[in-house]
Structures are given as C-alpha cells and as structure tokens.
C-alpha cells in the first residue's frame, strides 16, 4: 500500500478539484507552455533536475510547475509573497503529489519557514536548481552560506521588520542544521532563473561584488517577459485589484503612479483606460519625457499628495510614499503598490496608528487628526493580494521563458558555457516564445523573401533585431 502523500502545507486540500478545473482552463490560454511540453517532453531535458521554486503560487504557476515536471524535473514550491497564493491552486498541486508550502495570508514567520522547507529535499539531498521571483530563495542560500562561513555580524543588524524574521530563521538554521548545510546546497546548485526586476537587481549586485555563487539567467529582461508581463499584464491586473479591494468608481478620479518603467507604463494605462485622470512621477528624464509625450501630467509626489484619490507605487525603490505624503492626502485616499516588495510605502510608520480591517487585504488607517487612508495588501503586490494577478495568456510568455532558462542552465551548460554571471536568453529564443503565442490570438505573420532578408542583413527565419534594439 502506497503511503499517503503529506509533504505539503496548504490551506485546504479539499480545494484541489476546484483548482484542477481552473488549471485546465488556464492551459487553454497558455499556448507557450503547452507547446513546450509537446516539443521537449519526449526528450526529458530536466530529468535529474531538482528545482526549488519560489514564485507566486497561482493557477498560472501551477501550469508552469506541471510543465517542469512533464519535462522530467522534481520540484518543491513556495510562494514568493505572503498574499499572492491562490489556495485552490496550491491544493491542486499538493493533490498531484508535488510538495508545495503556500497559504494566502501566511505570516512572515511561516513564509521564511516554508522557504527553508523548500530546500530540505524529500528523500534527502538538496535542490540543484532554483527558479526565483524576487530573489528570496537565492538570498537564503547566499546569506546562509555567508553566516556559516563565520561572517555573522549582519545577522544582528536587520534593516527591516522582515529581516528581523529572516535573520532569526538563519540563526536557527545555523544552530540546528549540520555543519556545512548551506555549503552543500550552494555546491549542488547549477543555476537560478530570476523572474522579476527586483530579483534581477540583487543578482547584478552580487555579480558586481563577486559573490554570485552560480550562473543566473535574467528572465525579466527577455523582451517577451518585460514588454508583455510587466506592461500588458499590469494594464489588466492593476485596476482589477483596486476594484476588487474597494469597489471604487475609477472614472473621474485622479490617480498618481510613481514610476514609468514597464510596470508603471502598464499601470498608468490601466487607470487611464478605466477613466481616471492620471499623473506620473519619475526620476529618469527619459521616462519622464515618455510619460509627458503619452499625455500624462508629470509631477512630484509632494504635488500629488493632496490632489490624487488613488496612489500606486511601481518603482522597485524604497520610501516612495512617505508618512509625510500620507498625512497630506485626502480623507480615504486609496494607497497601493505593484512593485515586488512592500517598502515602496512607509508601512512601518503606520503601525502605531489605528487600523481597521475592512476585509482581507483591505485596511482603513486613521491618523490622529481623524483623516483616514485605505491601504491595500499592506503595501504588497495589489494585483496578486486583492485580485488574482495577470491573465494566463501573458503569463504563458513569461513562464515559457522560465522553462527555457531552466533547460539552458541544467541541460545545456556544457564545457563551462555559463559562468558565475548573469545572462539573458538569446534573441532567437525570445522570438520563439513570441511565435508560440501568435496562433492563439489569430496573428498571421508576414515572411521575408530571401532577397529582403539579405537586404537588411538578417536570416529569413530570424532573429530580426540586433541585441541592442529597444522594442
């Protein structure tokens, strides 16, 4: 008799059937991943791969996980955000016999405990690959090894409430795990593929400092990720999150978007399409000029604070909305973030104020003067905390890139092809990902003749643009 599978932590395993139905629907909208299964499945390029995955545990991620396993991988999974898990998706993955540790609304203590559990491989041993979103799994190993090697001073100097919890976990691991625990993990990891802007920044910082432990592929800067997921995904999911959280009428409202990168561009478009009058703040003169040329009013946060009804941060930086900005806002202004971390808004400065929870991930905070502010998802990702994130179709492009990156690092890293540096996928694969999604939406591609291809110096089948081309 087969032992019952128990290597998971989910809210309710009874939600698995519901999750499976939604996974089936999502598969129809994710042609890139399904085509990847069909092309690579017989070759099993990930056979022997043990992938530690830290990425929002959504229905779309479930399709990614099952693509990785269809290609031969063994997987353990956690969410990379305490509010982004879809509990029925996690239940479906657990019911399929895949270890997953994720609950929507989990505590930060549980979040880091689950991350640690992800590295304790079933049957012994360690993972040999990481699939990351935001870099927390990568940082867990890097900082754990640093402390294991004797540099522990940083553990007593946390820079945030979350680091207090994270560093306490590392201290616990150093005390309880056998000597050399982190060194063994670090030795076995062949590479990491990173999903998002914030995690990519961390990787480049480590590369610059010479501390990166293994090769990394920057999935975020694949064109079919950043120019689609970051832009078109946010264009659909931002307003979805705000509406589900507040039921507010967007038309006629004044909205302020901090940051006009790809995420900011999508966010501003989302609000404009909903009928809001949109202002933008920027530090980069190029992005500021782009915003102005798109017809947005470019102002500072100080200008916008007393005027706007809705505030959205999309910068990847810290302290974008300060306590002073919040004090200057209108009564019941709506404040949210669509960047990866929660430090774009000074949430810590609000902890001593009066909080009233309206419903999950919606809080009303009252200032001493009686003014109130509506905060969504406690400053974490509003589109995943208050809604269900990006639609399946756009995530198919991102996750096809992730799958190809895992294959590159695990199966194609021959003769030291990938060193301890950060790479991007080649243009040919970027174009392949795009091509896989065309038929689903009825796109008919024009084909170059040989003489036309020769004239512009490309191959008939592509790639069609130089690496330096900006889409």
Curated annotation (Swiss-Prot):
It comes from the Bacteria. Substrate binds at residues 58, 133, 195, 225, 229. The keyword NAD applies. Binds 1 NAD(+) per subunit. InterPro entries: Adenosylhomocyst_ase-like_sf, Adenosylhomocysteinase-like, Ado_hCys_hydrolase_NAD-bd, NAD(P)-bd_dom_sf, S-Ado-L-homoCys_hydrolase_CS. One of its GO terms (molecular function) is adenosylhomocysteinase activity. Pathway: Amino-acid biosynthesis; L-homocysteine biosynthesis; L-homocysteine from S-adenosyl-L-homocysteine: step 1/1. It is found in: Cytoplasm. Its EC number is 3.13.2.1. The keyword Hydrolase applies. CDD domains: SAHH (cd00401). GO terms for cellular component: cytosol. It catalyses: S-adenosyl-L-homocysteine + H2O = L-homocysteine + adenosine. Keywords: Cytoplasm, Hydrolase, NAD, One-carbon metabolism. Its cofactor is NAD(+). NAD(+) binds at residues 196-198, 230, 259-264, 282, 317, 338-340, 383. PANTHER family: ADENOSYLHOMOCYSTEINASE. This is Adenosylhomocysteinase. The gene is ahcY.
């Amino acid at each position: 008799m087969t032992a019952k599978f128990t290597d998971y932590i989910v809210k309710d395993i009874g939600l698995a059937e519901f999750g499976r139905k939604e996974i089936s629907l999502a598969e129809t909208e994710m042609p890139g991943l399904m085509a990847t299964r069909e092309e690579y499945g017989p070759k099993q390029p990930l056979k022997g791969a043990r992938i530690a995955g830290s990425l929002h545990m959504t229905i779309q991620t479930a399709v990614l996980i099952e693509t990785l396993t269809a290609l031969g991988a063994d997987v353990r999974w956690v969410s990379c955000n305490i509010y982004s898990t879809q509990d029925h998706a996690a239940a479906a993955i657990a019911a399929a016999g895949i270890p997953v540790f994720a609950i929507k609304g989990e505590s930060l203590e549980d979040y880091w405990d689950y991350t640690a559990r992800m590295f304790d491989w079933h049957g012994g041993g360690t993972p040999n690959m990481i699939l990351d979103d935001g870099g927390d799994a990568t940082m867990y190993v890097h900082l754990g090894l640093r402390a294991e090697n004797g540099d522990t001073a940083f553990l007593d100097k946390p820079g945030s409430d979350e680091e207090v919890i994270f560093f306490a976990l590392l201290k616990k691991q150093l005390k309880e795990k056998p000597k050399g625990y982190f060194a063994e993990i670090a030795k076995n990891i062949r590479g990491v593929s990173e999903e998002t802007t914030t995690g990519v920044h961390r990787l480049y910082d480590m590369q610059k400092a010479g501390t990166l432990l293994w090769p990394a592929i920057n999935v975020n800067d694949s064109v079919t990720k950043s120019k689609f997921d970051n832009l078109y995904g946010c264009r659909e999911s931002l307003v979805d999150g705000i509406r589900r959280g507040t039921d507010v009428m967007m038309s006629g409202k004044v909205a302020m978007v901090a940051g006009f990168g790809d995420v900011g561009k999508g966010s501003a478009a989302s609000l404009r399409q909903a009928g809001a009058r949109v202002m933008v703040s920027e530090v980069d003169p190029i992005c500021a000029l782009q915003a102005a040329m798109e017809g947005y009013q470019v102002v500072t946060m100080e200008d916008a604070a007393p005027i706007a009804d809705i505030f959205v941060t999309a910068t990847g930086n810290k302290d974008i909305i300060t306590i002073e900005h919040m004090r200057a806002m209108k009564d019941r202004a709506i404040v949210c973030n669509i960047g990866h971390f929660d430090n774009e808004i000074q949430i810590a400065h609000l902890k001593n104020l009066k909080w009233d929870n309206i419903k999950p991930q919606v809080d009303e905070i009252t200032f001493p003067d009686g003014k109130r502010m509506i905060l969504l998802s406690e400053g974490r990702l509003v589109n995943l905390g208050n809604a269900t994130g990006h639609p399946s179709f756009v995530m198919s492009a991102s996750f096809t890139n992730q799958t190809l990156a895992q294959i590159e690092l695990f199966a194609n890293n021959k003769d030291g092809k990938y060193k301890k540096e950060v790479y991007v996928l080649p243009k040919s694969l970027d174009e392949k990902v795009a091509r896989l999604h065309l038929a689903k939406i009825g796109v008919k591609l024009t084909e170059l003749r040989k003489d036309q291809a020769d004239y512009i110096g490309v191959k008939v089948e592509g790639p069609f643009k130089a690496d330096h081309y900006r889409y």
